[in-house]
């Protein structure tokens, strides 16, 4: 059977929260089958566990934020994206603040941590959410949609009307049957505009943001000396975010995702819309890995390779 996965050993790192600017210690620990991805605020007098769940996402204005009884864990999308890309089903994530550290602004550090810990198959069937009917959410001209598809593919279109973004392409379509998440998506960094960063800092946000963890643009160009990691890094980062946002549903999706100018809020609304229509999906497992969609085998150590 196609089995669930966790990590083999505990790994730790330290970073800063992109909005608080505060130091955050992050520890990843193995978890038993059917645990899911569970975030734990270990800095509190009594640690609070918050399982990743579409219905636990609260604030989505600047990041995807898990909330439970007034306790928050913010900016979970890059780590969740890495877990999706590497096929991690079960994991404990201990943090000493309310933000997951931003690291370099991509999912690459989290991929490295998970690969360093080692990936271990578990004696339990991996569960997928198979979309059986189309589901769509719209907000003005923005939309996000899931269609039935035996695999996982995404088509994302952005519209930033900026010379540097225009040059790199505003649309990307990826099918993970023939694309490596680690090579092609994981290193894409978050990005922002210099004038917006200043406004956010005046509001007490983006205190940890810098060119070490984001692509920064002025009105005309990219300000980072080292330029881009991918020719189409902007749209690839939006896809990286979407993969993480979608993975909070608790299992990998078997679906085709299409989005235009979508963000954390619309992605979460799409998951809630799917879950509200039980006839639009089913939970499936694969007794024979050969019958599973291409790209979910364990041999390559990744889900999408």
Curated annotation (Swiss-Prot):
A Pfam family assignment:
LpxC
Give the HAMAP family listed for this entry: LpxC
Q: What InterPro entries does the record tag this protein with?
A: Ribosomal_Su5_D2-typ_SF, UDP-acyl_GlcNac_deAcase, UDP-acyl_GlcNac_deAcase_C, UDP-acyl_N-AcGlcN_deAcase_N
Protein's pathway: Glycolipid biosynthesis; lipid IV(A) biosynthesis; lipid IV(A) from (3R)-3-hydroxytetradecanoyl-[acyl-carrier-protein] and UDP-N-acetyl-alpha-D-glucosamine: step 2/6
Q: What is its EC number?
A: 3.5.1.108
Q: What does the entry list under GO cellular component?
A: membrane
**BP-aspect Gene Ontology terms:** lipid A biosynthetic process
Listed NCBIfam families: lpxC (TIGR00325)
Record's keyword terms, sorted: Hydrolase, Lipid A biosynthesis, Lipid biosynthesis, Lipid metabolism, Metal-binding, Zinc
Question: The organism sits in which domain of life?
Answer: Bacteria
Q: Which reaction does it catalyse?
A: a UDP-3-O-[(3R)-3-hydroxyacyl]-N-acetyl-alpha-D-glucosamine + H2O = a UDP-3-O-[(3R)-3-hydroxyacyl]-alpha-D-glucosamine + acetate
Residues of the active site: 264 (proton donor)
Q: Which GO terms describe its molecular function?
A: metal ion binding; UDP-3-O-acyl-N-acetylglucosamine deacetylase activity
Q: What is this protein called?
A: UDP-3-O-acyl-N-acetylglucosamine deacetylase
Cofactor(s) this protein requires? Zn(2+)
Q: Which family does it belong to?
A: Belongs to the LpxC family.
Concerning Gene3D superfamilies, the annotation shows: lpxc deacetylase, domain 1 (3.30.230.20), lpxc deacetylase, domain 2 (3.30.1700.10)
- Is Transcription given among the entry's keywords? no
Per UniProt, Zn(2+) binds at 78, 237, 241
Q: What does this protein do?
A: Catalyzes the hydrolysis of UDP-3-O-myristoyl-N-acetylglucosamine to form UDP-3-O-myristoylglucosamine and acetate, the committed step in lipid A biosynthesis.
First-tier enzyme category under EC: hydrolase
């Amino acid at each position: 059977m196609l089995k669930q996965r966790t990590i083999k050993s505990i790994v730790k790192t330290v970073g800063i929260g992109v909005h608080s600017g505060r130091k955050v210690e992050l520890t990843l620990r193995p978890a038993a089958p059917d645990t899911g991805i569970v975030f734990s605020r270990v800095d509190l007098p009594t640690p609070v566990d918050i399982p990743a769940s579409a219905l636990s996402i609260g604030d989505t204005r600047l990041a995807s934020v898990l909330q439970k009884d007034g306790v928050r864990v913010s900016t979970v999308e890059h780590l969740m994206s890495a877990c999706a890309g590497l096929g991690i089903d079960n994991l404990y994530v201990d943090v000493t603040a309310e933000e997951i550290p931003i690291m370099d602004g991509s999912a690459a550090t989290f991929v490295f941590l998970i690969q360093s810990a080692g990936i271990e198959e578990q004696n339990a069937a991996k569960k997928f959410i198979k979309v059986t009917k189309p589901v769509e959410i719209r907000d003005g001209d923005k939309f996000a949609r899931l269609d039935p598809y035996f695999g996982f593919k995404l088509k994302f279109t952005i519209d930033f009307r900026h010379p540097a973004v225009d040059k790199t392409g505003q649309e990307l379509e990826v099918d993970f049957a023939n694309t490596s998440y680690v090579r092609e998506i994981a290193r894409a960094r978050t990005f922002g505009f210099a004038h917006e960063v200043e406004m956010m800092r005046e509001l007490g946000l983006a205190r940890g943001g810098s060119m070490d963890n984001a692509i920064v643009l002025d009105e005309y160009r990219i300000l980072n000396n080292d330029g881009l990691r991918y020719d189409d890094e902007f749209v690839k980062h939006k896809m990286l975010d979407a993969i993480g946002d979608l993975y909070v549903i608790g299992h990998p999706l078997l679906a085709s995702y299409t989005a235009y100018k979508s963000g954390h809020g619309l992605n979460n609304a799409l998951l809630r819309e799917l879950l509200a229509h039980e006839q639009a999906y089913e939970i499936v497992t694969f007794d024979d890995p050969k019958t599973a969609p291409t790209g979910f085998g364990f041999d390559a150590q990744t889900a999408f390779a």
